[in-house]
């Protein structure tokens, strides 16, 4: 039987040493599902609430004992006895139990931990891997990875405002080959940084955080590292940026302190267009502030036909906000972060809405991660065709990549690696 007989949460630590919620769900059959929740550094204003204790005497106020208590009491009482296969029903019970738009009572970290653990338990009970349990028996694609090799912004203590500089191995024939390509470029970049006297310490997501004079210098380093590893930038490898523009948008201007310049939204769109013209950039995330819809419209009109424009802080994995963006014709891709919305069911709804409107989806980690690899299975289950889960270092990032290797091995000949077809909204 797949009825839930026990739900138990605990406080564990994430990759930054901050508390987060882990949950175990036990079924009548004796199987157990376990899941842990990630946490972001640069967060969208409209994200579901991550409930923290606020007690400055514990973990500087970042404890999650209240969220744990909500799981072990209200949520457990509401869900024990329900069939774990009823994922949508279970998630809806938690949504109604919380009673707010942003999971403000129970905390999205509480509801998501339970939601993911229920899915894992149900998959185990059915004898299926999680990606098959959630994705069904149809054909599946492994995702093209966005590998964060240079960190800036909120993810590093350096001079760069743009938060992530990523490589995408589009010339690979398999995920295994793509991972090898990324790792070889990562190590070539480390040697290059070392030779130029830059520190080779890594940021929150495993990328290097050199103190550079400009964003162009970071992109040029990536070109050099790609070539040093034996690959061609623009053919084997394309670049992606996460601007996280909301972090440097103040008083109606985009302030690039590293370059000593401030831009209006029209000027910043031109700045980004200049980078696209000079470097092989295929994807730009959060190119405008989350509330600058005018700027997003300008950017989409300027670059949306040839570059993937990803809404993260803009859409916060929320189907209602995504629907508004689709109606207004802004961006052309959705970044998918399960903890932005707080349940698996709502996450899957957002991905489905994006697909139906020819918006690409990019499954994503957070900067504060755990060893939980659920998003790897989700990327395959939803046929997202793209995943963003950090650099080629730190076990919290590699856990996702290694799970994708296992999935590709299990799927064997049925595993497709989409390469440039991952950018289907651009007609690639």
Swiss-Prot record:
**What are its cofactors?**
Mg(2+)
Which PANTHER family does this entry report, sorted A to Z? Answer: ENOLASE
Pathway assignment reads: Carbohydrate degradation; glycolysis; pyruvate from D-glyceraldehyde 3-phosphate: step 4/5
Q: What broad class describes the main subcellular location of this protein?
A: cytoplasm
* Signal peptide (UniProt feature, chain positions): none
User: Which organism does this record belong to?
Assistant: Neisseria meningitidis serogroup B (strain ATCC BAA-335 / MC58)
Q: How many cofactor units bind, and how?
A: Binds a second Mg(2+) ion via substrate during catalysis.
Its name, as the record gives it, is Enolase
Its recorded reaction(s) are:
(2R)-2-phosphoglycerate = phosphoenolpyruvate + H2O
The function of this protein is:
Catalyzes the reversible conversion of 2-phosphoglycerate (2-PG) into phosphoenolpyruvate (PEP). It is essential for the degradation of carbohydrates via glycolysis.
State any single GO MF term: phosphopyruvate hydratase activity
Recorded family membership: Belongs to the enolase family.
Keywords (alphabetical) are: Cytoplasm, Glycolysis, Lyase, Magnesium, Metal-binding, Secreted
Q: Does the keyword S-adenosyl-L-methionine apply?
A: no
